[in-house]
Amino acid sequence: MTLTTDSFQDDVYNIVAQVPYGRVITYGQIATLIGRPQTARLVGYVLHGAAEASGLPCHRVVNAQGRLVPGWTAQRGLLESEGIEFRLSGCVDLRRYGVMDDWLGNGASARFPLQK
């Protein structure tokens, strides 16, 4: 199976578009859902290139520790406006606000939330 940039980007955007209000997902979780768990950094690269006018809720994507994008000062405010609270460390509690448990539930397919 060949990884094409366009299909990978489309899959990333598709997943991010489905992250509900008040919830977050990590770069690695997106990569896993696409079926390419080793491409978390590429997910970050793709999202960094997303135009702000795209309408994607990119602010709902955090790193594996729940940390925010360095230098993106608006991200925290956007998440707080959705009711997400932060730990003293500045991280999002992934167990509380992460979407993966809802999506994967009882052993659902890793590609479960992709709706094309």
Per-segment meaning from a language model:
Residues M1-K116:
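Nucleic acid-binding interface residues in structured DNA/RNA-binding domains
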